[in-house]
Curated annotation (Swiss-Prot):
One of its GO terms (cellular component) is cytosol. One of its GO terms (biological process) is cytoplasmic translational termination. This is Ribosome-recycling factor. Belongs to the RRF family.
Length: 185
């Protein structure tokens, strides 16, 4: 069993929150957000490449994304990848540029997205609690090896619980902000 390392546990917990923020940024809110296209992979030159490696994505207007494809021969594969991504976007081709108007979200779709944001947050909370459990196990192992006293273990457990609560609060705040943005409240 690994020795108790609070800095490593904190880094892993914060990693779960950053992962959550990344997942949340990919949820469509009715406003143009370049992160919406981050997960798209395009089949070009006989391999699969992230969209960011074949084009520049920008948001020139609040409800419009612009995808500037660097190589004209890749416009069709990029358009196909965007259409098949399941984001409900219909690219309009204009030379090397694809314009993506962001349609309004239906109330039903907003609720689905809010539920998805909650699910992402719950997954992050579970990951954070698993890291806490690893820390608690390491503390108990250190105590059983007589590397720390019972009082030191209890102090460290209290510390770890406070850290866990703080990090979970950050995850909940990120999810609540995204849900508010999605539901337009």
């Amino acid at each position: 069993m690994a020795k108790y390392d609070k800095a490593d546990l904190e880094r892993r917990m914060k990693g779960a929150v950053e992962s959550l923020r990344g997942d949340l940024s990919g949820l469509r809110t009715g406003r143009a957000n370049t992160a919406l296209l981050d997960p798209i992979v395009v089949e070009v030159y006989g391999s699969h490449m992230p969209l960011a490696q074949v084009a520049t994505v920008s948001a020139p207007e609040p409800r419009l994304l612009s995808v500037q494809v660097w190589d004209k021969s890749n416009v069709t594969p990029v358009e196909k990848a965007i259409r098949s991504a399941g984001l409900g976007l219909n690219p309009i081709s204009d030379g090397n540029t694809l314009r993506l108007p962001i349609p309004d979200l239906t109330e039903e779709r907003r609720k689905e997205l809010a539920k998805l944001a909650s699910k992402y947050a719950e997954n992050a909370r579970i990951a954070i609690r698993n890291v806490r459990r690893d820390g608690m196990d390491a503390l108990k192992a250190d105590e059983s090896k007589k590397e720390i006293s019972e009082d030191e273990r209890k102090r460290a457990e209290t510390d770890l619980q406070k850290l866990t609560d703080d990090i979970i609060k950050q995850a909940d705040e990120a999810a609540a902000a995204k849900e508010k943005e999605i539901l337009g409240k």
